[in-house]
């Protein structure tokens, strides 16, 4: 019988799930790992839910860094931020290969599991790169800069360092409307990740009277050259689903 280990869709829970699956000693071919919510249940499978444990997460992370490489850890972390259903099981299989081959496993793209990890990492990295360019802030009451995004992958912790470096003395928030989480950066302090309640989300979603919104829209429309408009090229470089929270398209 196949045993399926399941957990919440966050990094701590996923690393704990890896720990428990490995410690079960059921055999790598006899287990699968999935993030919740689980869609269709498979027949003849034993499902085991795993709760996040910070100590077990730290143990797994130490093992990855010391027995494989720091590069492999970064690869695993970014793949864990993906929205792909197979990401957790792919991470587990990659770690099995990594503990066998060592640091060079990241170069073994001929191995299907390594290639799949590379694809997950690349997709997440590309999305994070786009959001660094497309994030727009609005000034909320209390002089807090707030931005809303709805990324497919969980890229908040990947884009936050960029804005922490560029806006170190500003109070700002980047809110993931899809996951109800936010990166909060108090002025001249380190940023942190937090979960938002529905009431907090509603309060932070109110329209602001920031005058720079209209100024930016006017600038965007004014610099455009009508004879050179190419909407197909624009959609290729800036997909439509990014535009919901972009000031110039509202």
Name each model-derived stretch.
Residues 1-54:
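N-terminal ordered "arm"
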Residues 3-11, 48, 112, 144-155, ...:
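Conserved aromatic-histidine-acidic binding/catalytic patches
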Residues 13-24, 93-97, 158-165, 213-221:
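Short, hydrophobic/amphipathic alpha-helical patches that form generic packing surfaces
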Residues 34-131:
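Charged, alpha-helical interface segments at or near domain boundaries
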Residues 48-56, 189-201:
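Acidic, Ser/Thr-rich peripheral helices and adjacent loops at domain boundaries
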Residues 74-79, 177-178, 229-235:
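Short coil/turn segments at secondary-structure boundaries
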Residues 103-193:
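Internal, well-folded beta-alpha domain core
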Residues 171, 182-183, 187, 201-250:
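Long, compositionally biased intrinsically disordered terminal regions
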